[in-house]
């Protein structure tokens, strides 16, 4: 399912492509990013190269490269990946999906992730011919990442539950907090803004 390009003010979301493998590789070697997302799997560079080259054609998911939207003389200033946002586990019967976000370190806390999520939610809940017409978008966020939890809450995600001690954090444990936003909650939030 090749994702559509989703343009915004600060960021432009486009399908992940083979040349993005280098930046994805960097992301997988960011210790703090790995810690905050609970990523424990390791991958070879060849696996990342292969994945980046083929992920746009995989069913049941949309994987976008988050890129800067800045323009100069009618051209994009950069098309470099600064983060990745994913809708996966898309279930057309229950009209639900899972959301995942990862930003490269230099781009965290600057509003890029917020805008990327807003664009993906607009696409996910759009009931027009170009939207997914989803009813629910869920995610997991680790308790060691309160900044991400606050971001998701500010975008309308509601805490549904907690998986206690679900991830290792060095010698400690971290809970996985399950959050979601439903289509009526999303529409009410958009009307209110």
Give the positions of each predicted feature.
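Conserved hydrophobic/aromatic "anchor" residues
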Residues: 16, 123-125, 157
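Conserved active-site alpha-helix within GNAT-family acetyltransferase domains
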Residues: 110, 114-116, 143-161
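Amphipathic alpha-helical recognition patches that constitute DNA-binding helices
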Residues: 12, 23, 98, 102, ...
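GNAT-family acyltransferases
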Residues: 1-106, 127, 131, 173-174, ...
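Amphipathic alpha-helical segments that line or abut small-molecule/effector binding pockets
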Residues: 22, 114-126
């Amino acid at each position: 399912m090749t994702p559509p390009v989703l343009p915004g003010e600060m960021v432009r979301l486009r399908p992940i492509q083979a040349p993005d493998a280098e930046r994805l590789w960097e992301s997988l070697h960011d210790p703090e990013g790995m810690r905050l997302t609970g990523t424990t799997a390791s991958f070879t560079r060849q696996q990342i190269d292969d994945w980046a080259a083929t992920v746009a054609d995989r069913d049941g998911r949309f994987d976008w490269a988050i890129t800067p939207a800045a323009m100069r003389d009618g051209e994009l200033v950069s098309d470099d990946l600064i983060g990745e946002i994913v809708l996966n586990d898309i279930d057309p019967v229950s009209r639900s999906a899972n959301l995942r976000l990862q930003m490269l370190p230099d781009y965290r806390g600057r509003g890029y992730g917020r805008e990327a999520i807003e664009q993906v939610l607009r696409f996910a809940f759009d009931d027009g011919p170009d939207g997914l017409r989803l009813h629910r978008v869920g995610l997991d966020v680790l308790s060691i990442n309160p900044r991400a939890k606050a971001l998701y809450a500010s975008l309308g995600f509601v805490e549904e539950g907690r998986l206690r001690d679900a991830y290792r954090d060095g010698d400690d444990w971290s809970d996985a907090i399950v959050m979601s936003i439903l289509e009526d909650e999303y529409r009410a939030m958009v009307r209110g803004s």
